[in-house]
A protein has these predicted regions:
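Conserved alpha/beta-hydrolase catalytic His-Asp/Glu region
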Residues: 48-96
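Conserved beta-strand scaffold positions in the cores of enzyme catalytic domains, especially
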Residues: 16, 102-104, 120-123
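Catalytic active-site module of serine/aspartate enzymes centered on a nucleophile-bearing elbow/loop
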Residues: 121-150
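Glycine-rich nucleophile elbow surrounding the catalytic serine of serine-hydrolase chemistry
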Residues: 1-8
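Flexible "cap/lid" loop of the alpha/beta hydrolase fold
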Residues: 12-47
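Short beta-strand/loop motif that positions the catalytic acidic residue
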Residues: 104-106, 110
């Protein structure tokens, strides 16, 4: 979501649709905002990323064990260097406000970017950070309309 918003600044777009993301640094969870000030994010023990089941349970909640193989495919970027870079980019993102053409779809149960920090979004009840996988029916029913409407 953040990357596509940055790309929209250097190319002409009609709309940007982000899912399970944030539109500005103000929507980041308080811990991420504090981490920027303290630089605590630099000391995260990212080696635990190889313990895939723990990672999945942390990010998506304990009810996901049945879907481990699907999440393994979805979370293919588990390289420690990539994660350090990505966390640094997210925590230090400077965007203060979003563009009018951004459509934000967000789950009410997202643990990575909790919905209490999210403003002006289409909320998917029960959706978590991986709702693009778990709520396929909702996306199949609603995305075509969101893409084509004015």
């Amino acid at each position: 979501g953040i990357i596509v918003q940055e790309l929209s600044k250097i190319t002409v777009v009609k709309k940007v649709i982000i899912i399970s993301s944030v539109k500005s640094r103000h929507e980041l969870p308080l811990m991420m905002q504090l981490s920027k000030k303290t630089k605590a994010y630099k000391y995260l023990p990212l080696h635990w990323i190889d313990d895939f089941e723990s990672l999945v349970v942390f990010v998506f909640g304990p009810m996901v064990k049945k879907r481990i193989s699907l999440y393994r495919k979805y979370l293919s970027f588990r390289d420690e260097n990539y994660l350090k870079w990505a966390i640094h980019q997210i925590v230090n993102w400077e965007q203060n406000k979003h563009d009018k053409y951004t459509i934000h779809i967000h789950g009410t149960h997202d643990l990575v970017f909790p919905s209490i920090y999210i403003k002006n979004a289409i909320f998917v009840n029960g959706g978590n950070h991986a709702m693009i996988l778990r709520k396929a029916t909702w996306f199949n029913e609603n995305l075509p309309r969101l893409i084509t409407q004015g």
